[in-house]
């Protein structure tokens, strides 16, 4: 198969690294508006399969020209490009996967292209990161093994191995996105009813092998498409994992309106957004700076099988790759989108149209693919008679 990777940033680079190592991948084209950046990645990865091109993703004609001759597109661009990329892929007759974008309902707009994609014989899968992404695939896999699905509980965190004050956290993805997840309300299902709860609320203790006690709390966006894929759930909740005390400190910032987009103040005659100041202060403070990080993930799917109450639990503790200087979050995210792109290219995934991950990605095959890449996902089944 021939794969086009859009975006030579961290995720695009790591997806390309994974793709060129696959025997099934004949050629990889890495496209970016900054050609020098793409060419630098090509030099770093030392693969004859890999080539760089300049593409402005805001120009559908350039996008279409770049897509031609490829089997699958791995879209590792900022989420605002996702709808344009999906539409262009459908028009060009090329399969496409992306990292998602629930801010501004971008993923919803991609999902609305289902009939067009189906008619074109194209598969589009959005939301293929960790959360959403890995958690959706594992939720769908757990649900497929039950006769009735009653609850899905999700816990995910990307944290430093050795925390440092003031927040005991280092950012492993966009800080802007993090503030949005902490500020916007979280959608949950409780007692069969959809409702919103404040982010950073309902803090609970949580433990993982080698890590704990930690804390978990509600944040926005994590339940993604699961409430629609499983509308009859009695309970659906997503919580972010951090070191203890983090939620309380961040809640103060939110309560002071320092994280909101719509707040401005006047200082010495200048209009200033406190959020912009906060981001400028936090970015150098919270930079990972090459320190070790870890992704902790737990998915708990409950329901009934053969009349018995059954709980399926999936868990991973994944560390960074020191040799290649790749964060744990980048590994788990890039491996997920690359592995699923290859499942489409190999003909393992054959459904055509636009589907969220939980409805189309075979969980057992996905777990095997991640194991090959050093990301081990354990599975535990508990049956209550």
UniProtKB/Swiss-Prot annotation:
Keyword NAD in record: yes
Catalytic activity: L-lysine + NAD(+) = L-1-piperideine-6-carboxylate + NH4(+) + NADH + 2 H(+)
Top-rank taxon, per record: Bacteria
One Pfam family named in its UniProt record: Sacchrp_dh_C
Enzyme Commission code: 1.4.1.18
GO biological process terms on file: protein homooligomerization
Gene3D superfamilies: Dihydrodipicolinate Reductase, domain 2, NAD(P)-binding Rossmann-like Domain
Keyword Oxidoreductase attached: yes
One Gene Ontology MF term: lysine 6-dehydrogenase activity
Biophysicochemical property: pH dependence: Optimum pH is 10.1.
Temperature dependence: Optimum temperature is 70.0 degrees Celsius.
Alphabetic keyword roster: NAD, Oxidoreductase
Recorded family membership: Belongs to the saccharopine dehydrogenase family.
Subunit structure: Homohexamer.
Function summary: Catalyzes the oxidative deamination of L-lysine in the presence of NAD. Can also use (S)-(2-aminoethyl)-L-cysteine as a substrate, but more slowly. Can use both NAD and NADP but the preferred substrate is NAD.
PANTHER family, per database record: ALPHA-AMINOADIPIC SEMIALDEHYDE SYNTHASE, MITOCHONDRIAL, SACCHAROPINE DEHYDROGENASE
Full protein name: Lysine 6-dehydrogenase
UniProt source species: Geobacillus stearothermophilus (Bacillus stearothermophilus)
Organism lineage string: Bacteria, Bacillati, Bacillota, Bacilli, Bacillales
Gene: lysDH
């Amino acid at each position: 198969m021939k794969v086009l990777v859009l975006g030579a940033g961290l995720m695009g680079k790591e997806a390309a690294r994974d793709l060129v190592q696959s025997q099934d991948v004949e050629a990889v084209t890495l496209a970016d508006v900054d050609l020098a950046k793409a060419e630098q990645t090509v030099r770093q990865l030392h693969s004859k399969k890999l080539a760089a091109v300049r593409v402005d993703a805001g120009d559908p004609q350039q996008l279409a020209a770049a897509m031609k001759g490829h089997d699958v597109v791995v879209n590792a661009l900022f989420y605002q490009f996702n709808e344009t990329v999906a539409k262009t892929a459908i028009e060009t007759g090329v399969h496409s996967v992306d990292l998602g974008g629930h801010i501004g309902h971008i993923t919803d707009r991609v999902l609305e292209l289902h009939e067009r994609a189906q008619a074109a014989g194209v598969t589009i899968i959005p939301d293929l990161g960790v959360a959403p992404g890995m958690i959706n695939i594992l939720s769908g896999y757990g649900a497929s093994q039950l006769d009735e699905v009653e609850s899905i509980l999700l816990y995910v965190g990307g944290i430093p191995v050795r925390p440092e004050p003031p927040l005991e956290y280092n950012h492993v993805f966009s800080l802007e996105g993090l503030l949005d997840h902490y500020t916007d309300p979280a959608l949950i299902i409780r007692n069969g009813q959809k409702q919103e709860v404040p982010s950073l609320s309902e803090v609970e203790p949580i433990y993982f092998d080698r890590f704990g006690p930690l804390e978990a709390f509600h944040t926005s966006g994590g339940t993604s498409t699961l409430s629609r894929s499983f509308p009859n759930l009695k309970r659906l909740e997503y919580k972010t994992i951090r070191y203890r005390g983090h939620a309380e400190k961040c809640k103060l910032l939110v309560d002071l309106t320092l994280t909101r987009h719509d707040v401005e103040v006047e200082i010495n005659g200048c209009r200033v957004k406190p959020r912009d100041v906060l981001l400028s202060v936090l970015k150098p403070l919270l930079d990972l700076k090459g320190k070790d990080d870890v992704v902790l993930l737990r998915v708990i799917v409950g329901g009934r099988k053969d009349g018995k109450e059954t709980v399926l639990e999936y868990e991973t503790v994944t560390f960074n790759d020191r040799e290649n200087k790749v964060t744990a979050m980048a590994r788990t995210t890039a491996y997920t989108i690359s592995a699923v792109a290859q499942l489409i290219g190999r003909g393992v995934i054959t459904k055509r149209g636009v589907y969220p991950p939980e409805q189309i990605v075979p969980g057992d095959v996905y777990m095997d693919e991640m194991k090959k890449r050093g990301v081990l996902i354990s599975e535990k089944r508990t049956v209550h008679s």
